[in-house]
Amino acid sequence: MFKLTSSPHIHSGKLTARIMLWVIFGMLPALAVQVYYFGFGVLIQICLAVALALILEFAVTKLRKKPSLFYISDFSVILTALILAMAIPPYAPYWVILIGTFCAVILGKHVYGGLGQNLFNPAMVGYVVLLISFPVQMTGWMPPISLLHEPPTFGDSLGLIFSGVTGDGFSLSQLVSSIDGLSSATPLDSAKTWLKSGGSATDLLNQPIFLPGLEAGLGWLQVNLAFFIGGLFLIWKKAIHWQTPVAILLSLGIFCGLFDLFGNAQAVGFFAQLFSGAMMFGAFFIATDPVTAPVTPKGKWVFGILIGLLICLIRQFGNYPDGVAFAVLLANICVPLIDQYTRPRVAGYGLNGRN
């Protein structure tokens, strides 16, 4: 006897849970590098985000009378929490990640009906809510711990996140200000502020957070390289499509080259654009979300080019130094339109004056 089931009857065998696990696995190198350069804070943020995300997923699916364990076991909510936790400053107060996780899971996902129904990337919804609502907490990045006199221990990291001070009573700002030339700003933020104030690129690169001779920051370059390697792994495993990240990086390079060509004094160099902030993170792990990205190869190219253009414009003219999250969300709005104009025509379309 054959069992009657709904389509599709032929599939690739790539279950949602398997793809999510590959993406999580691809993020592990960047996580290890981030812990090495910026301390244990990111691990604590991940634990808080994942714990709350699982609780919310369980509660909402129960309220909607759906099988909670089935939806939790696809690992999508864990991936959302992981992306959000790795995107925020490692030593942000604990309530920041809790609010962001709530917004990501509830507002970014379940308001639209759950996995597969959301218009926007859930993690970026949570991130943008935090960035707009709590700009001070969301811009307080720890410089690489190798530049500090005494790198924070795991206990110090717990203290900074839950009480705002280490075991010795030092706040994050006090730890940073103890070293001349250091600030809690990211290299992109420092470069944007410095160049807008009329400072020279040579003096900018002499700051301790920048690698000698490069506009990319210490720690940030290595984290972006790790995300790049993880992204190549995902492409190799066919967990993501290559068109979107390639389109983002190529378009960003072209538009940044145009700014350099016309001599924009406030423009950050091409190398810094690619290997600073959340560039590789966004290109390979955020913009490639299959739910919120176009479905056709041509659409993925258009989507990636749009994101690259928006990132370049926000970084050059906007108030925010990075712009990846805003670019992805703005491009998400355009996905239905992109799909409409890039999907292949059905055979026989337009024959005899009929569609």
Swiss-Prot record:
One Pfam family of this chain: NQR2_RnfD_RnfE
Subcellular compartments: Cell inner membrane
This protein's UniProt keywords: Cell inner membrane, Cell membrane, Electron transport, Flavoprotein, FMN, Membrane, Phosphoprotein, Translocase, Transmembrane, Transmembrane helix, Transport
Highest taxon above the source species: Bacteria
Spans through the membrane: 13-33, 35-55, 77-97, 98-118, 128-148, 216-236, 245-265, 267-287, 294-314, 318-338
GO cellular component entries: plasma membrane
Residue list for modification FMN phosphoryl threonine: T186
Biological process (GO), any one: transmembrane transport
EC class name: translocase
Membrane topology: Multi-pass membrane protein
Record-listed E.C. numbers: 7.-.-.-
Essential cofactor(s): FMN
InterPro entries to which the protein is assigned, alphabetical: NqrB/RnfD, RnfD_bac
Subunit organization: The complex is composed of six subunits: RnfA, RnfB, RnfC, RnfD, RnfE and RnfG.
Function noted in UniProt: Part of a membrane-bound complex that couples electron transfer with translocation of ions across the membrane.
Family listed: Belongs to the NqrB/RnfD family.
PANTHER family: ELECTRON TRANSPORT COMPLEX PROTEIN RNFD (PTHR30578), ION-TRANSLOCATING OXIDOREDUCTASE COMPLEX SUBUNIT D (PTHR30578:SF0)
Protein name: Ion-translocating oxidoreductase complex subunit D
Organism encoding this protein: Actinobacillus succinogenes (strain ATCC 55618 / DSM 22257 / CCUG 43843 / 130Z)
Lineage: Bacteria, Pseudomonadati, Pseudomonadota, Gammaproteobacteria, Pasteurellales
Gene from which the chain derives: rnfD
